[in-house]
């Protein structure tokens, strides 16, 4: 039975944890206006990322039907196309090193892989590259609340706007639900 011991939490809220490229861009006094300016783009990025996440079939399809085979081939071609586009983006736009990151609508924590560490209290924008096929990063303005000597950086976001916050919370919840379902699956030996 799932006991919640592996639940990923940040600022006392369910969080999303994975390995992604992340960087910090210092900016003087980010305001709610900056978060609003990033909002539409962040919503589109989160919606695209959600569409790319593998959710699996909602209903068991008839694998013998010709339509199922066509859909599977189409899905494989789209995945191949996304991989190729991602490789082109990666070749033309270098990204930061992928690091373990945990984030939700309230903040983010990651280990800095290179470069100088920001100071606690520094203001700026956390940039999280969600997928190789997405050209732009998620841009989340906030303030550094803690920096550890080994390079862990914790940022509290400015209010991101309802649409962005809802999408981040939804994605964190889905990931958490899949982890619970995976923990409940009997292991095959």
Question: Which residues fall in each region the model found?
Answer:
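Structured alpha-helical
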Residues: 1-189
